[in-house]
Amino acid sequence: MYPGEIAKSTPDKPAIIMSDTGESMSFLELHEYAERMANLFQAAGLKPGDHVALCLENRMEFLPICWGAHYAGLYYTAISSRLTAPEMAYIINDCGAGAFITSTYKAQEAIELEDDIPHVFLRLSVGGNIDGYDQLEALLAEQPITPVGPRVEGADMLYSSGTTGRPKGVKVPLPETALGDTDGVTALLGLLFGANQNTVYLSPAPLYHAAPLRFCRGIHKIGGTVIVMPRFDPIELLESIQEYKATFMQVVPTMFVRLLKLDKTEREAFDVSSLESVVHAAAPCPIPVKKQMIEWWGKIIHEYYAGTEGNGFCYCNSDDWLSHEGTVGKAILGTLHIVDDDGAELPVGEIGGVYFESDGNFEYHNDPEKTESAKLNNGWSTLGDIGKIDEDGFLYLTDRKAFMIISGGVNIYPQEAENVLTMHEKVLDVAVFGVPNDDLGEEVKAVVQLLDPGQASPEVERELLLYCQEQLAKVKCPRSIDFRDELPRHPTGKLYKRLLRDEYWGDSESRIV
């Protein structure tokens, strides 16, 4: 179904509630907002299959805007609200967006990138005035709530890493199905996690991430209520569970860690008995952390392994995990294969590249080389991880290819920081990679070879950190920099980053489980 169908039977039922203010939007209001939004897109000249982009913090309008694009049969790209203006402009241009929507929260960046997105003909601001942008609220008031045609499903097109370190859009074919038809994610929400029209789904993560956005969309299709937190805070999370009697929630392991660091008296002060299903993914979860969470909340914790690409899906419940500690689950969509560097399949227990054999079809937008590199000749595709499968068919992730960093559930691609730091006048060579962090799982570390090694000092470290932060979102930048007289490079120019990385991991090992 879709919000309009739900509204026919329960028009006043809350579809969205902001956890901090209690502000709510009913299913009828959500449907009418989406219809007006779809009409606005169509009136501007956008047609099914075209692209729109949005960069918003977690706020009431986020999901209704996405639903408007969905109603209009458009691709919609949600951009991280942490990005700088140049990073935002790159994604807006790369996805080919004809419309861009942002809020006063990103007003400075919106103004900075105005001249850098020449193909965007519809520029809209939410929550106030931004120079060069039309106010969305005023334009929506002029739009009808009549359906636009043709009535087909839109789709998100979210961004992953590219071969150069730049993000790349993960594009799947438009569904070509009637608006409201059940999709794979919505079906899984009901099948695996028991989601239904009575579900109260608490969403503490940024909505621009694939899983939160798709889970919220699926809950709306089922007819459940979505509670949106502006940001994650452990106490506020527990307060929201108690206040709204949340039944379902998706988190990342860092949130588990922050919750467990609360005093026991603080944890026990809140009633979380309404929870029926808690799902985690997106980052490594230390075995002791997961054990403690199961002890606290019970066997309601689920885990999955999948990607924005939608090429496969592994899953385990608490019982499965307790009998196979460290697993990320069994494949329930697609068939798992572990292969060596030549593409030959490996036996049980052997470590190699993790591939899915499935009907899932995706491409990296404007990057055929990356698309090809993610697939074998037989059609199997990978998310770039390596791991092993046990005799029961459970998957264990062992390491990450290309040393992608996962810090607090956020994927960070070190090539971006390397490209920036390399351009600094004092830098001769640089390597960026993840090092252990008890709270975040990993943090970003840089090792730099200076043009003049004698300049190595805390002052130069601060200079380089600030230089990076001026050009990239802070989350992508190193937290610290070490200096070396020379970095380990092969005569061909290949950097042996593993040699550097392993020094910092020590007994922790470069392992995900």
Describe each model-derived feature in a short phrase:
Residues P3, A43-A44, W67, Y71-E142, ...:
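Structural core segment of the AMP-binding/adenylate-forming
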Residues S24-L28, A155-D183:
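Conserved AMP-binding A3 loop
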